[in-house]
Regions:
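Two-component/phosphorelay signaling modules centered on CheY-like receiver
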Residues: 18-37
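Alpha4 helix (beta4-alpha4-beta5 surface) of REC/receiver domains from two-component response regulators
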Residues: 25, 70, 84, 95-110, ...
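Helix N-cap/capping motif at the beta->alpha junctions
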Residues: 38-47, 68
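Receiver (REC) domain active-site loop signature in two-component systems and cognate sites
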Residues: 63
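C-terminal output helix
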Residues: 116-129, 133, 137-138
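CheY-like receiver
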Residues: 130-175
Length: 175
């Protein structure tokens, strides 16, 4: 396993299904996470953000009230958000490519299909911690860079202003 101190990681788990929430919490505890905060829905999670200041959020897509998708959009764009850069791992049973795109376009860092496995949770958690994506601000989007592939063969002009890309450290804080 990696050298990450999971005991120092503060994780917010948001799911309106108590059984799924407990499963994710149990998996995180098995990794050594001790600072786990649970929220029963998007509104509850939003109310906790100022006091909790999580390093990572694991969030269900389909919840009553504020959905996971609505939560991520609000997290990334609302002027009252305490940390728009916090990494978000979206959990869902909807794995069609359109759902993956919607989560990505809302600002989710990673996508995790239900039912979750220990290996899949670890993989996504390591992805957001060890390989954080730079954040991009565009006219209609703010969130982690959506590019997954880097091409050494691209010869055209860089279309992004480097001043608009923000690097994060291993716990999602601005560098």
């Amino acid at each position: 396993m990696s050298g990450i101190r999971f005991d120092r990681l503060r994780v917010l788990v948001v799911d309106d299904n108590q059984h799924m929430r407990k499963l994710v919490v149990t998996i995180l505890q098995a990794f050594g996470c001790t600072q786990i905060i649970e929220a029963v829905d998007g509104e509850h999670a939003w109310s906790l953000l100022p006091d909790v200041n999580p390093d990572v959020i694991l969030l269900d897509w389909q919840m009553s009230g504020m959905t996971g998708l609505e939560f991520v959009k609000k997290l990334r764009t609302d002027e009252k958000t305490p940390n728009p850069f916090v990494p978000v791992i979206m959990l869902t049973g909807h794995t069609h490519v359109d759902h993956v795109r919607m989560a990505r376009d809302a600002g989710a860092n990673e996508f995790l299909a239900k039912p979750v496995s220990v290996k899949a949770v670890m993989s996504r958690l390591l992805a957001v911690i060890e390989h954080p994506r730079p954040f991009v601000r565009a006219n209609t989007y703010f969130g982690p860079c959506r590019r997954r592939r880097v091409s050494d063969e691209y010869k055209g002009p860089e279309r992004r202003n480097s001043d608009e890309i923000v690097a994060l450290d291993d716990l999602g804080q601005k560098k």
